[in-house]
Amino acid sequence: KNNVVIVATGGTIAGAGASSTNSATYSAAKVPVDALIKAVPQVNDLANITGIQALQVASESITDKELLSLARQVNDLVKKPSVNGVVITHGTDTMEETAFFLNLVVHTDKPIVLVGSMRPSTALSADGPLNLYSAVALASSNEAKNKGVMVLMNDSIFAARDVTKGINIHTHAFVSQWGALGTLVEGKPYWFRSSVKKHTNNSEFNIEKIQGDALPGVQIVYGSDNMMPDAYQAFAKAGVKAIIHAGTGNGSMANYLVPEVRKLHDEQGLQIVRSSRVAQGFVLRNAEQPDDKYGWIAAHDLNPQKARLLMALALTKTNDAKEIQNMFWNY
């Protein structure tokens, strides 16, 4: 049997409600890793299991500090010859961000699988136990090597880059506009596609070369009608290095906002990345805005929250918008 480490970080999968009928009202991050493993003894038939409690938080409360700490712990684990795979139990709210970040900064061919649940461990028909079993099955599979970081939810295997939480009340909560990598049936993975984007061993970013417990400041401004420039100005004043504009449609920005945002870019060096609030599709460069003229960046198909992480990592390497644009094409 392969050796799999379960790294617990909290979330709904470690949550507890007042009664078994509380599936949506509960306290997250209450159940420790040993209890999670004990609740699914069948995982011991799949692999030799070790548990580590890295964090105990609801995932919306994760900051750069926790994200970097987790990446370093996971990196240390996969470097050990005795470890064949890692499962990370995680809150679903920001699971896609953590998965994508690890996909960019941890250099390994070993399976790293993030898993969570939509119902707390105390709920009737809790989804966490089967999800955890399936995640261990995936992480212990030799077929799961070189796939990049994955998210396993509801027996679907997703690429960290593509996956997003698309539904907040059902167990089939995670989706990818490009489809799942595969599916799991009774502990066996069946594969249908792979990602052509750079990840893990092919990434130019490396957690071992990132110092400190904070990334360059990048924030998101959500687009709508009747917008004001105040949020952009406030973030610039606070020292933020880049803003992800979660624009309407094709990453659009209202014409009455453009002069002020361009001023912040030109005079204060505030980088602007155009993403979209639309769940599917991608942002075309020089379509709604003349990005070449403005020196702005198009996020391609990355949603705003993933664009924020890639931009933060990009700023650890360069301030050149053309170089950063290439990163958005390649990752």
Curated annotation (Swiss-Prot):
It is an enzyme of class 3 (hydrolase). InterPro entries: AsnASE_II, Asp/glu_Ase-like_sf, Asparaginase/glutaminase-like, Asparaginase/glutaminase_AS1, Asparaginase/glutaminase_AS2, Asparaginase_C, L-asparaginase_C, L-asparaginase_N. Its EC number is 3.5.1.38. GO terms for biological process: asparagine metabolic process. It catalyses: L-glutamine + H2O = L-glutamate + NH4(+); L-asparagine + H2O = L-aspartate + NH4(+). Disulfide bonds: none annotated. Its main location: periplasm. Transmembrane segments: none annotated. SMART domains: Asparaginase. It is found in: Periplasm. One of its GO terms (cellular component) is periplasmic space. The keyword Isomerase does not apply. Keywords: Hydrolase, Periplasm. Residues 2-331 form the Asparaginase/glutaminase domain. The active site is at 12 (acyl-ester intermediate). PANTHER family: 60 KDA LYSOPHOSPHOLIPASE, L-ASPARAGINASE. Homotetramer. This is Glutaminase-asparaginase. It comes from Acinetobacter glutaminasificans. The lineage of its organism: Bacteria, Pseudomonadati, Pseudomonadota, Gammaproteobacteria, Moraxellales. The gene is ansB.
